[in-house]
Amino acid sequence: MLTLKIFVYTCVIFFSSLFIFGFLSNDPSRNPNRKDLE
């Protein structure tokens, strides 16, 4: 049961960080050099 809980928390943190880093890297205000988003 403890192993399952640790596995679930790891997946949640992994996908959350993946979403956050992907959102930050795709944010035009943080990366003004990328003009292909417009």
UniProtKB/Swiss-Prot annotation:
Membrane-crossing segments per the record: 4-24
Record membrane topology: Single-pass membrane protein
Keyword annotations from UniProtKB, A to Z: Chloroplast, Membrane, Photosynthesis, Photosystem II, Plastid, Reaction center, Thylakoid, Transmembrane, Transmembrane helix
Pfam family for this entry, one: PsbI
Gene Ontology terms: cellular component: chloroplast thylakoid membrane; photosystem II reaction center
Localization annotation: Plastid, Chloroplast thylakoid membrane
Protein's GO biological process: photosynthesis
Protein family per UniProt: Belongs to the PsbI family.
Assembly: PSII is composed of 1 copy each of membrane proteins PsbA, PsbB, PsbC, PsbD, PsbE, PsbF, PsbH, PsbI, PsbJ, PsbK, PsbL, PsbM, PsbT, PsbX, PsbY, PsbZ, Psb30/Ycf12, at least 3 peripheral proteins of the oxygen-evolving complex and a large number of cofactors. It forms dimeric complexes.
Function: One of the components of the core complex of photosystem II (PSII), required for its stability and/or assembly. PSII is a light-driven water:plastoquinone oxidoreductase that uses light energy to abstract electrons from H(2)O, generating O(2) and a proton gradient subsequently used for ATP formation. It consists of a core antenna complex that captures photons, and an electron transfer chain that converts photonic excitation into a charge separation.
HAMAP family to which the protein is assigned, alphabetical: PSII_PsbI
Official protein name in the record: Photosystem II reaction center protein I
Species annotation: Cyanidioschyzon merolae (strain NIES-3377 / 10D)
Gene: psbI
